[in-house]
């Protein structure tokens, strides 16, 4: 779950933010636009748009934003026994599925709107377009993996497709029988998507390892931490963008590090190893 923020200019209804959640397997996206993403807005979105529609979630992965991690979210997670996992700080790739969905939603909206302040009117159609488009990682549409059949999109109403023409000739009993067959095959379709996704991840992993060299750190080493442009410590392009030194006090799987200041105070949030570099005295 993540927030697209802020959209300028704001929509005519003054909405400037889009709260987005994606299912990692089906790639189904739930999203809604708001004037501001407050703690209550996030809690209501999780309860109304996710839990009440799709059932209790097992984990929810968010970034470290204060509006996505608050006492209201904690209460909902405790009430429904949901695990709330946080991605590594300053590392959008750790929540890559929703970041990719954000990019695609913005790209679809950009192509659909004529007046920038009217994007909220086209937003539901952008979601429909995303849900009915084949995703590279699964080989099928999110709509198919959720409902077991493809959606009837608006263009098929104007220009009937072969599927629509064939279904129009079916009797009610034949249509029901066909729908039952589609639902019966949904498990098989999902297993095919699982296999496709595994092969896709293997290809992406091989491509990543070919061009990226692993950086190994050990406990006790001194490092410098990168200052990112959105941080308060950032002073401009011509000022050093590293701060420290810090000490590595724990090495986590996946390349994340837990750092501590030189006075022994441990940072509460891990940071990815590509945001630090060795410090030599």
Report the location of each language-model feature.
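Integrase module of LTR retroelements
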Residues: 1-189, 193-281
């Amino acid at each position: 779950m993540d927030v697209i923020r802020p959209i300028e200019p704001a929509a005519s209804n003054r909405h400037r933010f889009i709260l987005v959640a994606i299912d990692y397997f089906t790639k189904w996206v739930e999203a809604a636009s708001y004037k501001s993403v407050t703690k209550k807005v996030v809690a209501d979105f999780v309860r109304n748009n996710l839990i009440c529609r799709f059932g209790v979630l097992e984990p929810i992965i968010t970034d470290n934003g204060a509006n996505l991690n608050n006492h209201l979210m904690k209460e909902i997670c405790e009430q429904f026994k949901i695990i709330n996992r946080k991605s590594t700080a300053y590392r959008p790739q750790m929540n890559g599925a929703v970041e990719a969905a954000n990019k695609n939603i913005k790209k679809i909206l950009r192509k659909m709107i004529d007046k920038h302040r009217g994007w909220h009117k086209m937003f539901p159609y952008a979601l429909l377009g995303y849900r009915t488009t084949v995703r590279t990682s699964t080989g099928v549409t999110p709509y198919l993996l959720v409902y077991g059949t493809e959606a009837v999109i608006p263009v098929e109403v104007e220009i009937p497709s072969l599927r629509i023409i064939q279904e129009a000739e079916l009797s009610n009993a034949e249509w029901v029988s066909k729908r039952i067959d589609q639902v019966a095959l949904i498990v098989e379709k999902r297993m095919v998507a699982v296999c496709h996704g595994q092969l896709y991840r293997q290809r992406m992993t091989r491509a990543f390892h070919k061009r990226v060299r692993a950086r190994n750190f050990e406990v006790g080493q001194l490092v410098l931490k990168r200052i990112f442009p959105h941080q308060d410590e950032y002073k401009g392009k011509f000022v050093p963008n590293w701060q420290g030194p810090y000490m590595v006090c724990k090495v986590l799987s996946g390349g994340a590090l837990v750092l501590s200041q030189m006075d022994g105070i441990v940072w509460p949030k891990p940071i990815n190893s590509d945001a630090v570099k060795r410090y030599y005295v």
